[in-house]
């Protein structure tokens, strides 16, 4: 049985926030469990979300829920230990849909995990993400 490895002490960073409006579109809305809030990236290619855990965690699944039209066709999952360089764990390919999508990959032990959104379905490269969870 897999469970979320995210906690209140997980540190997160994002590549950008739409119009720098963190009160309305900030990274905190990725993890709040509410259906009506979301993280919106600003325009530009290769948006990302980075999570830093207080200790090494085992990860084997990622759950994402995009807004259709503002999703990503190719994502890269990278991880490392505390001071190491990020290395690729897996590529995965979400659909352009509003539904929760789940992706499973070989279990990895990491203290940092980055999800990179390599090509947005939006013409301007924006990503709108309502839910992000990492399980292991």
Swiss-Prot record:
Taxonomic placement: Eukaryota, Metazoa, Chordata, Craniata, Vertebrata
The record's listing under InterPro entries reads:
Galactose-bd-like_sf
Q: Name one GO cellular component term.
A: nucleus
Q: Where in the cell is it found?
A: Nucleus
Q: Would you say which domain of life the source belongs to? A: Eukaryota
UniProt keywords (A-Z) are:
Nucleus
What is the protein name stated in its UniProt record?
Nuclear receptor 2C2-associated protein
List the source organism.
Xenopus tropicalis
Main function? May act as a repressor of nr2c2-mediated transactivation by suppressing the binding between nr2c2 and its response element in target genes.
Q: Which family does it belong to?
A: Belongs to the NR2C2AP family.
Q: Indicate whether Cell wall biogenesis/degradation appears among the record's keywords.
A: no
């Amino acid at each position: 049985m897999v469970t979320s490895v995210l906690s209140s002490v997980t540190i997160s960073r994002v590549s950008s926030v739409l119009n720098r409006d963190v009160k309305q579109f900030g990274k905190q809305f990725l993890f709040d469990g509410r259906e009506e809030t979301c993280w919106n990236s600003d325009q530009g290619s290769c948006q990302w979300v980075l999570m830093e855990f207080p200790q090494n965690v085992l990860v084997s699944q990622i759950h994402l829920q995009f807004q259709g039209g503002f999703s990503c066709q190719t994502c890269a999952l990278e991880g490392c230990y505390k001071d190491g360089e990020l290395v690729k764990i897996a590529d995965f390919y979400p659909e352009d849909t509003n539904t929760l999508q789940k992706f499973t990959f070989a279990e990895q032990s990491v203290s940092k995990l980055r999800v990179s959104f390599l090509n947005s379905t939006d013409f301007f490269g924006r990503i709108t993400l309502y839910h992000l969870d990492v399980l292991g």
